[in-house]
Amino acid sequence: VKETGVKYHVCHISTKESVALIRKARAEGLDVTCETAPHYLTMNDSMLQEDGRFKMNPPIRSEEDREALIAGILDGTIGMIATDHAPHSAEEKSRGLEKSLMGVVGLETAFPILYTKLVKTGVLSLEKLIELMHTNPRNRFCVGTPLEEGQPASLTVYDLDKEYTINPDDFLSMGRATPFAGEKVFGACRLTMYHGSIAWKDETL
């Protein structure tokens, strides 16, 4: 990066060493950004089970690593959170922790898990979470459009007061493998819009 001046983005950081390296690079003025994922921010390796839904790449790390990621979020070293959404069939994830394919789903769980475990516990503000999941990625990669009057909206509506239990059978993704199955969370998705059209809505409302 120093030699070429290239913009550099690191995906799925999960260790304290990665946080330290990126913090150092940014302090030196290098155009380096990074993201991590909900499972690295809310889980540690003591929570692993002999089940394919706990297998992803990078793997779940130690509590020390998790705490370093939180610190990186708070001091701005980590500017984005991504879902790391990797859907696999039930068969591909049924071979146990060692033999199942890498990857878990994240689209349906990312916001409610982070809102419940980081915002409602006071670690992050809701505004900071939106910045990490939406504003910063949009600005870094020049994708999407701002929400402005007269422009076609792309947005998601959540009921922040709605508590529910994560049930993979309710997912719309091909994949059902999530380490968060059975977790009670707040933040139920009620509506999604893409370029001004309703892509999905909760028909129970």
What are these regions (language model features)?
Residues 1-81:
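Histidine/acidic residue-rich metal-binding segments in metalloenzymes
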Residues 2-5, 74-81, 86-158:
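His/Asp/Glu-enriched, well-ordered alpha-helical/loop segment
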Residues 8, 35, 84, 114, ...:
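Residue-level signal for inorganic ion chemistry
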Residues 19, 42, 89-91, 156, ...:
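Glycine/Thr-rich phosphate-binding loops of Rossmann-like dinucleotide-binding domains
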Residues 48-55, 92-100, 172-176:
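Short glycine/proline- and charge-enriched loop/turn segments
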Residues 55-65, 101-105, 178-185:
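A short acidic, glycine-rich active-site loop
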Residues 99, 149-204:
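C-terminal cap of metal-dependent C-N hydrolases
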